[in-house]
From Swiss-Prot:
It is a lipid-anchor. This is Ferroptosis suppressor protein 1. It comes from Homo sapiens (Human). It is an enzyme of class 1 (oxidoreductase). The keyword Nucleus applies.
Length: 373
C-alpha cells in the first residue's frame, strides 16, 4: 500500500474522528497514499496513554507522551469537539458550527476513563503535560496510596508507584478475586499477583470501595478514610481510580442509534464497516469486535479501514478483519512485567525488553515522524 492512490479530484475525502492510536495510524497511511483527509480531535496533541501511568509517577516523563498533531498532519488536522454527524449531507459537525464534508468516515473515538490512565479534555499540549507533572507531585507527597481497581490499569499503576517509590505503602482494592483482565491466561493473572506481592503492594481482593463518591481523587490529603463493602477501612493520603473505562460514543451516538451495541460501540461487519453504511468505518475501542481494547489492535483496524476505502474506490474486493490469538503485555514498572504473545505465556525478560522500559513511546514518535524530546 506504499504507492499513491490516484482519485478524481473531490471524489474522495476521508474524515477521521478521534486521534488516538487508530486515528493516527489511519491518518499516517492516508497521508502516505496522498488521499485527502481531515483528522479531528479535541486535543492539539496525540496522547500516548499506554505510558500515562508512568507519566504520573516519574518527573519529566509526560512530555514524551504528548505529540503535536499539526506538526505531522499540517492542514489535515483540525482541533475541535465533534457534536454530531449529519449522515444525509455527509458532514461531521463541530462545536462552534463548522461542518467537515466527507465521502468516507473513520470513527476512532476510543474510550474515556478516569485520569491519570486517560486524559479526555479539550486541552493544549502544555496544559496536558502540566496535569501529569502535578500528579507526580501528589504521588511524591503521599506516604500512603490507595489504587481502586485491579484490572490492567490498576495493577500497572500500583507497580509503577512501588517501582519508583519503594518506601510508599500502596494498597490495591479490587472487587474480583483474580487481578488483571479476564481474557488473560490464568498463569499470567497469577504472576501479576505474585509480582505485586513481591513489590510489597497490599491487596484487598473481593472487596468494593463503598464510599467512592465522597473521596477526593488524585489529590494529596493529610487523612482520607477509604471504606469497603466488607467493612474494611484504609487510611491513606491519596486515592487513584483505575476503573470505569467506557466507550466514547458521544460523537456518533445520535446518528447511529440503531447500530449501537449495549456497550456503546458500533456494530460492524467483517470489513469494519458500520452496519448499513458502506462508507463509514469504526476502528479501535468504538468498533464492536470481540477483542480487548488495546492500542496495537486499533492500529490493525486502521490498516483494514484504509485498505478498504482505497479498494472500494478502485472497485476491488474488500479485506476482512480476522482477530488472531491474544497478545497482551503488562508492564509492572520499568524492570518487570508479564503477559502473553499469540496466546502463549511470556515472562519478565521478554516483556521488559518489548514494553516495560519504553512503553512503546518511541513507536508513536516514529508513527508521527517526529523526534522525541
Amino acid at each position: 500500500m506504499g504507492s499513491q492512490v490516484s482519485v478524481e479530484s473531490g471524489a474522495l475525502h476521508v474524515v477521521i474522528v478521534g486521534g488516538g492510536f487508530g486515528g493516527i495510524a489511519a491518518a499516517s497511511q492516508l497521508q502516505a497514499l496522498n488521499v485527502p483527509f481531515m483528522l479531528v480531535d479535541m486535543k492539539d496533541s496525540f496522547h500516548h496513554n499506554v505510558a500515562a501511568l508512568r507519566a504520573s509517577v516519574e518527573t519529566g516523563f509526560a512530555k514524551k507522551t504528548f505529540i503535536s498533531y499539526s506538526v505531522t498532519f499540517k492542514d489535515n488536522f483540525r482541533q475541535g469537539l465533534v457534536v454530531g454527524i449529519d449522515l444525509k449531507n455527509q458532514m461531521v459537525l463541530l462545536q462552534g458550527g463548522e461542518a467537515l464534508p466527507f465521502s468516507h468516515l473513520i470513527l476512532a473515538t476510543g474510550s474515556t476513563g478516569p485520569f491519570p490512565g486517560k486524559f479526555n479534555e479539550v486541552s493544549s499540549q502544555q496544559a496536558a503535560i502540566q496535569a501529569y507533572e502535578d500528579m507526580v507531585r501528589q504521588v511524591q507527597r503521599s506516604r500512603f496510596i490507595v489504587v481502586v481497581g485491579g484490572g490492567s490499569a490498576g495493577v500497572e499503576m500500583a507497580a509503577e508507584i512501588k517501582t519508583e517509590y519503594p518506601e510508599k505503602e500502596v494498597t490495591l482494592i479490587h472487587s474480583q478475586v483474580a487481578l488483571a483482565d479476564k481474557e488473560l491466561l490464568p498463569s499470567v493473572r497469577q504472576e501479576v499477583k505474585e509480582i505485586l506481592l513481591r513489590k510489597g503492594v497490599q491487596l484487598l481482593l473481593s472487596e468494593r470501595v463503598s464510599n467512592l463518591e465522597e473521596l477526593p481523587l488524585n489529590e494529596y490529603r493529610e487523612y482520607i478514610k477509604v471504606q469497603t463493602d466488607k467493612g474494611t477501612e484504609v487510611a491513606t493520603n491519596l486515592v487513584i481510580l483505575c476503573t470505569g473505562i467506557k466507550i466514547n460514543s458521544s460523537a456518533y451516538r445520535k446518528a447511529f442509534e440503531s447500530r449501537l451495541a449495549s456497550s456503546g460501540a458500533l456494530r460492524v461487519n467483517e470489513h469494519l464497516q458500520v452496519e448499513g453504511h458502506s462508507n463509514v468505518y469504526a476502528i479501535g475501542d468504538c468498533a464492536d469486535v470481540r477483542t480487548p481494547k488495546m492500542a496495537y489492535l486499533a492500529g490493525l483496524h486502521a490498516n483494514i479501514a484504509v485498505a478498504n476505502i482505497v479498494n472500494s474506490v478502485k472497485q476491488r474486493p474488500l479485506q476482512a478483519y480476522k482477530p488472531g490469538a491474544l497478545t497482551f503485555l503488562l508492564s509492572m514498572g520499568r524492570n518487570d512485567g508479564v503477559g502473553q504473545i499469540s496466546g502463549f505465556y511470556v515472562g519478565r525478560l521478554m516483556v521488559r525488553l518489548t514494553k516495560s522500559r519504553d512503553l512503546f513511546v518511541s513507536t508513536s514518535w516514529k508513527t508521527m515522524r517526529q523526534s522525541p524530546p
